[in-house]
Amino acid sequence: MKLLSLCSVLLFSLVLLLIPNSPDNVQVQGNHLLVNNSPYYIKGICYHPVPKGQTIRDFQTIDQDLELMKEAGINTIRVYAPIDDIQVLDKIDAAGLKLIVGFGYNQNGVFDILSETYLDYIKKYKDHNAILIWELGNEYNYHPEWFGGDIINWYNALSVATDQIHDIDPNHPVATAHGDMPDKQALASNPNIDIWGLNVYRWDQPQSVFKEWQTVSDKPVYLSEAGADSYMKISKAGFKQGENQRAQAVANAKIIDAVLDRSDVASGIFIFSFTDGLWKAGNPDQQDIGGWAPNSSGVPYDGAPNEEYWGIVDINRNKKETFEVIKNKFLNFLIDKNN
């Protein structure tokens, strides 16, 4: 009898091991993002780790990076291209973080929208627990030249892609990352987008975008990019020219406060970005000033996006002053579940 009981226990345990764990339930309800039927507030970071001296993304520091993210109270990572590495995805999930996966339009046939290979990625990973949202494009509204000079070509492709994802994965919302506020054409062309991401650089006061959003949509919205760099091209607003971590910290504090204060509308914020990107503006072996980004005159406090100075940590993972600011804001914020 004891042997029979032991066999039964072992058999039951084996069955449990063979049954895959169900991923968290992610859905949109009203203007809120829900995970397992509870409001989920994005305390996010944009993440594109390119090592010093290289130009291609590499996850060799993923363990260290995840520890730093957790310390800072970050719960969501936003990447600009799919991560086709189950070990990296498993580590993100094991760390208790969620992931917004971005798909580009034309990435030479690598999980992109043009070739429809992005659907292969979604089919492969749609049941992975790390996945929060599928995100299509990144501020493409600034680049009609990529679509034959007519941005409606992008909006049409976006609409088709949204419907295709809904057909194969009804369990994750579909988003797009739009450069600031979408106009009537963008909204009318994409009625099936579940949640909108907005890349917003309005100095250190992004809150006006939420009032504008409420006048045009009742769908949930998050800031897919916001923040400041740590280099002042000129002296301004009391901040000295040159590398200035204090300016970045002050700006990010005000930006985060402005978003958290509108948690009744905003589903969260992604600070741009986790680490400095030495590959962006010159020699990838050294940190250069300069670089360029569209519609970037609203970058605090000099109106100049020094592209290699955006990290909350530097290339060697040393914490900048803004790290502690973000940590304090994120760890001390709890979503009001009655909103």
Report the location of each language-model feature.
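Positively charged n-region of N-terminal signal peptides that target proteins for export
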Residues: M1-S5
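Active-site mouth of glycoside hydrolases
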Residues: V28, L34-I42, C46-W196, P206, ...
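Glycoside hydrolase catalytic-domain groove-lining segments
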Residues: P173, Q185-K240, A266
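A structural motif corresponding to the C-terminal end of an alpha-helix
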Residues: A72, K124-N129, A161-H172, A258-A266, ...
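Active-site clefts of carbohydrate-active enzymes
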Residues: N141-F147, S217-I255, I271-N283
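Soluble or luminal CAZymes and related metallo-dependent hydrolases
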Residues: T61, I113-T117, N153-A157, Q205, ...
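Bacterial Sec-dependent signal peptides at the C-terminal "C-region" and cleavage site
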Residues: L10-N25
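Aromatic-rich peripheral "rim/lid" segments of glycoside hydrolase catalytic domains that contact
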Residues: F272-N339
